[in-house]
Regions:
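Glycine-rich flexible loops
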Residues: 1-411
Length: 411
């Protein structure tokens, strides 16, 4: 488990989600131990005793949005209820402990508060101290919970600023500092993409082209999927490492497996016949039906799906008043766009998204799913798909800060 702790510590630093000197992993072997000796070990040992877990992460977020959201909540509330897709899938809601509740309390009382929160949810916010996230079986699960809280509080806070403005003293100053640090275009220089069609590159020495491709030529497709998956994580276009990616060679969809890490796809790519003639798709991404629908309805060969945050925020910004639809991510039937890109509703997996995305993506090769993320496609290879995703997220980031200035007067 020591190797896993080192691995996920590095991922937190890469993601810019946790303050470096605040990262504390705790693990249960015969006894609870930690990656660094600290004053919290005794308390979290008691937390382990109250829960059925093997790992726990305690760290401060690099952005203050979680604490600000707690302060913006009405007195008496103890949960944040974001509406983005990742929260609904992984957390449902986020319990929190207000600073005034734990400040001055004994560590025994704080332990009781933490256990109460974590018996119901995988992670919780302790205002002024940090986020605590659990792993029932693995360190990775604790990392995912922490990363999801960073993602969802980022999305919820910035969306709330657009809709409700600033509510707290010094909130505008904090926002301006965030804007200076984050309103910049990611550096995409140095990214290398294999020109497509990849199956032609892979089988260029074979005539006639066999079906399916033999193992060695397939490796070019696998290698490119792995590389582009890493790019997607490294450039911050996902939360933690979730998303999915696929390539279609005319008969077979090569797609990342469900719950796989986009930055570690080696050995986790499934070849799935598009006609459904095998059971290979059983471990494939839950969004395989959406990828299949795109390939059946368009000339695209490469599809990339990520969760860029500013695109998600603007997809959820709606000025419709007195709308009777509450479950917008599933039921909204309005035709909406942001920065010229269509926004669609639909559940993941075999739900409405498998119908809405293929139709929406057909013309431009890109669309945004409400509260969820971007689907981008390329006709021959992943270069266009990746660059479309980056371009849309950049435009949404610029539009977000334009709207924030317009609505709040921020400069």
């Amino acid at each position: 488990m020591h190797d896993q702790i080192a691995k996920y510590t590095q991922k937190l630093l890469r993601d810019r989600t946790a303050v470096p000197d605040s990262i504390h992993f705790y693990r249960l072997d015969d006894v609870v131990s930690t990656n660094r000796q600290d004053e919290w070990l005794a308390m979290f040992t008691e937390v382990f005793q109250g829960l059925d877990i093997t790992a726990l992460l305690f760290a401060r977020l690099t952005l203050p949005f979680a604490d600000l959201l707690v302060d913006r909540e009405e007195p008496g509330t103890h949960r944040l209820v974001p509406k983005d897709s990742e929260t609904k899938v992984f957390l449902h809601d986020i319990p929190f402990i207000r600073k005034k509740e734990w400040e001055g309390a004994s560590k025994t009382d704080l332990t009781t508060m933490i256990v109460r929160c974590l018996k119901e949810r995988k992670a919780a916010i302790i205002q002024g101290l940090g986020v605590v996230s659990t792993g029932g079986v693995t360190v990775e699960q604790a990392y995912i919970g922490f990363s999801t809280i960073f993602h969802t509080t980022f999305v919820k806070y910035l969306l709330d600023v657009l809709t409700d403005g600033f509510k707290l003293p010094n909130e505008r100053m904090v926002f301006e500092g965030f804007k200076l640090a984050w309103n910049r275009t990611p550096d995409l220089s140095g990214l290398v993409f294999t020109p497509g069609p990849l199956e032609r590159t892979a089988a260029s020495h074979l005539s006639p082209r066999p079906n399916p491709l033999p193992q060695e030529p397939r490796e070019i497709i696998y290698k490119e999927i792995c590389q582009v998956g890493r790019y997607t994580v490294e450039k911050g276009f996902v939360d933690s490492f979730f998303g999915n990616i696929s390539y279609f060679d005319g008969t077979t969809i090569y797609i990342s497996q469900t719950t796989s890490s986009l930055d570690e796809l080696e050995g986790f790519i499934d070849p799935v016949p598009i006609d459904g003639s095998s059971t290979a798709g059983l471990s494939a991404s839950s969004e395989l039906p959406t990828h299949r629908g795109i390939y059946l309805d368009s000339p695209y060969r490469a599809v990339l799906h990520g969760h860029p945050r500013f695109s998600i925020i603007l997809s959820m910004l709606c000025d419709e008043k007195n709308c009777g639809i509450k479950d917008c991510n599933r039921l909204c039937n309005r035709t909406r766009t942001v920065c010229g890109v269509p926004i669609v509703a639909g559940e993941t997996g075999a739900g409405g998204m498998a119908k809405s995305v293929p139709a929406a993506i057909k013309e431009q090769g890109v669309c945004i799913v409400y509260g969820h993320g971007i689907f981008a496609a390329g006709e021959k290879d992943f270069r266009k798909a990746f660059m479309k995703m980056a371009e849309v997220e950049n435009r949404c980031r610029e539009e977000y800060f334009r709207l924030s200035e317009e609505r709040t007067g921020s400069k």
